[in-house]
Amino acid sequence: MAPPTFADLGKSAKDLFNKGYNFGFLKIDSTTRAGDNKEVEFKSAASHNIGSGKLGGNLDVKYKIPQYGITLTEKWNTENQLGTVIEVNEQFGRGLKVTLDSLYAPHAGKRSGKVKLDWALPTARVTADVGVTSAPVINAAGVFSRDGWLIGAAATFDSSSNKLAATSLAFGHSTPQYTLHSFVINSTDFGASLYHKVASNVEVGTQLGWKVGGNGADYALATKYAPSRDLTVRAKVNSSSQVAVAATHSLSPALKLTLSTQFNLAANDAHKFGLGLEFDPSN
C-alpha cells in the first residue's frame, strides 16, 4: 500500500480536530448518485454565516468513465465561479494520476488553472503541481515509508523570483492504533500531533505547535466518542481556552444532524453555535 501524500501526513489527528464541527454556520449538504454503476454524482452544499449573515453555496457534478480511468467534475458556486477538474488515472503509467484543475470567473474575466501529478508507489508517494500562468508557482513533495515509519519533504518554488518560497520537512510513524506526526516549516514553525484509537468507539488526539520568536507553545486536545451506532460526540480544547463540543445523530441511514458549539472560558462574548444537515441516500 502506498504511503499518504505529504498533505495527508497526520490526517487522523487533523480530522479529529476539524471534522464534525460547524459552529458559526448553518449548513446543509446533499449527495446523490445516478447511473447503473453510480458513475454520476451530484453534490451540493449551502451555508449561512450566523455572524455576518452571508449565504454561500456550491454544486459539483462528477462523472466517472472507469474504462478510460477518467473522472470529470464540473463545479459552480455562489461567487459565480465555474470550475472544471479532469482526472486521468493510470493511463500514463502505473500509479500515476494526472489532474487538470481550472477555474473561471465570468464576471471578472479571470481564468486560472493547475496541472497536478500524483505518483503512488508501494513505498513512496510523489506529488507536484504547477500553475498555468506566465510565471507559475511550482509545488513538489515526496513521502517515503518503511515498516510504518514515514519521512517527507515539500518545497514551493516561485519562478517569478527564481527562489524557494517555502520548505517543509515531516517525520512520523503510523499503525492502525497510533499515528505520530512531526514537522518543521521554513525552519521557523515546529509542530507535532499524536492520534490514538483507544477502542473501536473512542479516539483521542493532541496537537502541539511552536514558532521561533513566538510567545510560547500552542497545544490542543481532542476526543471522539460513539456511544451507539447513531450518535457520535466530539470535544476539543486548546491553549487559548477555547472549548468546542459537537454531536452528530443519524436520524436515518441517509440523514445526519449535527449540533455544535464553541465558547471561550476567558471571554463571555465569544460563544458560537452551529447546525448542519447531511443527506446521502447511498448510505
UniProtKB/Swiss-Prot annotation:
Q: Does the keyword Transmembrane apply?
A: yes
Question: What InterPro entries does the database record attribute to this sequence?
Answer: Porin_dom_sf (IPR023614), Porin_Euk (IPR001925), Porin_Euk/Tom40 (IPR027246)
Annotated localization: Mitochondrion outer membrane
User: Its GO biological process terms?
Assistant: mitochondrion organization; olfactory behavior
What is a single Pfam family found in this protein's UniProt entry?
A: Porin_3
What are the entry keywords? Ion transport, Membrane, Mitochondrion, Mitochondrion outer membrane, Porin, Transmembrane, Transmembrane beta strand, Transport
Domain of life assignment: Eukaryota
Gene Ontology CC terms: mitochondrial outer membrane; mitochondrion; pore complex
Any GO MF annotation of the entry = voltage-gated monoatomic anion channel activity
Q: What happens when the gene is disrupted?
A: RNAi-mediated knockdown results in a hyper-connected mitochondrial network in body wall muscle cells.
Role according to the record = Forms a channel through the cell membrane that allows diffusion of small hydrophilic molecules. Plays a role in maintaining mitochondrial morphology.
- Quote the record's domain comment: Consists mainly of membrane-spanning sided beta-sheets.
Query: PANTHER family this protein is in?
Result: GH26960P-RELATED (PTHR11743:SF70), VOLTAGE-DEPENDENT ANION-SELECTIVE CHANNEL (PTHR11743)
For this entry, the protein name equals Probable voltage-dependent anion-selective channel
